[in-house]
Regions:
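Active-site-adjacent loops and short helices of periplasmic peptidoglycan-processing enzymes
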Residues: 1-150, 159-160
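Extracytoplasmic
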Residues: 156-177
Length: 177
């Protein structure tokens, strides 16, 4: 075990061995936090597991973009009417933390954000993320949208076991189709 001490300026941290899943060190990793954009880890996982054809087309709409923009959420930059693929949405959700990409994935996978969030919460429980509850797929603040770094670590360790998901989250730059 390694001690973080005062060298880490953040209030919460966790370092996990990616191969074994063992916690190397942590700082307040069991505290309840608002996961914000870390939500998109679960969004991408659930969409990836729910949509068989990652090259299936999706038409972005202004109705998806506008409310997210008005709420001040980060966007990937897709335009209303733009024809993209589910794969583009996965990268758009993961890399620039695009809320419109995340919301579009929810629609593509389940037809509504509500149904998709139910699936996210079910998946969290299956992974053993017992201190996590999602209220949306974008990471927008909500008092009941919570997790812990321990739970996020469980999720990340699972994601990194999948080569395609590891590639998505490990990519530096992506150009849409």
């Amino acid at each position: 075990t390694v001690t973080l001490g005062d060298t880490v300026s953040c209030s919460h941290a966790i370092l996990i061995n990616a191969e074994t899943g063992a916690v190397i060190t942590q700082k307040n990793a069991e505290d309840i936090i608002f996961p914000a954009s870390m939500t998109k880890l679960m969004t991408v996982l659930v969409a990836y597991e729910s949509i068989a054809d990652l090259d299936a087309p999706f038409r972005m709409t202004q109705e998806i973009i506008d409310p997210l923009y008005l709420d001040g959420l980060s966007l990937a930059g897709f335009a209303g009417g733009e024809e993209i693929t589910v794969r583009d949405l996965l990268y758009g959700s993961a890399l620039p933390s695009g809320a419109e990409a995340s919301y579009a994935l929810a629609i593509a996978a389940c037809g509504s954000e509500e149904a998709f969030v139910d699936r996210m919460n079910d998946r969290a429980l299956l992974l053993g993320m017992y201190d996590t509850h999602f209220e949306n797929c974008t990471g927008a603040h909500h008092n009941d949208h919570v997790s812990t770094l321990t739970d996020i670590g469980i999720l990340m360790a699972f994601i990194m076991q999948n080569d395609e998901l590891a590639e998505i989250f490990g990519t530096y730059q992506y150009t849409t189709t």
